[in-house]
């Protein structure tokens, strides 16, 4: 990688002129609530009073776990800094407080915080903030609502320390954007195909088409075609996590099941680490809208659900490691050790396996060549933008495929659903079937399978076969969404746990019919959701015999915590 010099920054992000004399309190009240005198006094018990002078810098971009400041007198501002240029994001006055979600996640600061005038502040360290959030329900609501609203605003306006330059036709660009979006990190995106500034920057640095996307992180470091792991390292996503500490619980996977386990375990005082190979959300994170999840009458997107669950788990003290895969379970003795792809072993007394399952890939030789270039495994707003007003195909007959078809039909020219079976009744919720059947923009093709793909740099034509007649159809279609079947990623568990014929993890009474890799060492029998290894549990889609629904996964993740307490008492 290389570094952007201050003289070169004019190519990267032309700063918008902002009124630096912006008055505090002009933001919507949901973003900048004014604390009552009583609330301030309760905060004061955990905070340190600090006198500041005008212009004093309170923290800088890249500082570890910045504190929250409550303004008693004077004022403060939050500033985006880049290459000698500054942009005031917002400011806070008397009775207001700074901070957003990174204050509870423990990640590095993105912005500068600076006093606008001399005055008095209450400085609240991150650990004390978590104490207040855990003990005071009213203040917990005030802080969390403000932090969530601010992070959403930052994402929507692209206020952050990351700039992605790439092409809508680049699979690597889509992967980088999806990683940052699903992680919830604010970033700005410039498309080479529509933004001349982006092309000028790439020409300036001599970047070839094979090296896109270019990701500029921390407003200085330039990465060429980076992996999610490299982006996470550059931004310090996992830098505050102690990988040698013995944990009460390690959760593998940050989908609905894993996040539910993390929320309930952390809320009950357990030391929890979640390890996610990409970004949080799991398979549910690829869904644009889940309409049959309890409590969301108008539906909720998978990413929204995941973002709320992440904030909820972190507020109780859970830590989430992203862009790290688990390569091996070392199960010869306790505490067990979870070996990461960076070579580190994390010791833990209990483990919850919540890796989920991935969509089955049609057995076509050139499928991977079109991944991100016409073949997609998610249907979010990001993918929908790529195929506006065009014909698309959705493969699958489950809820995820149905949700994708309904969502894409709103902006695409039309949707063809390829379904292997002759009906949807056994695999899809009734409300979705009705939506699809009544939608004139969705065409159901029962008994059909994808048979061929063709194109050059991007998918151009698609063929499918109607199985009963053998008839093959070919059309010019540039976008296919694969959402059929489910396969677990459990090869790293071989030698430790019992798996079924498809690779899903066996648990509870299902273990009675198999011989485990290692003899069961305890007098008691395995508990519900417990695998063939004491203290190792499996929840969600990775479990053999599970119901592949978000609500079921969340239920299992919640229930397993009580069983973990019993296991920890045995250690």
Q: What is the predicted function of each stretch?
A:
Residues 79-81, 114-116, 216-218, 339-341, ...:
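A generic structural motif
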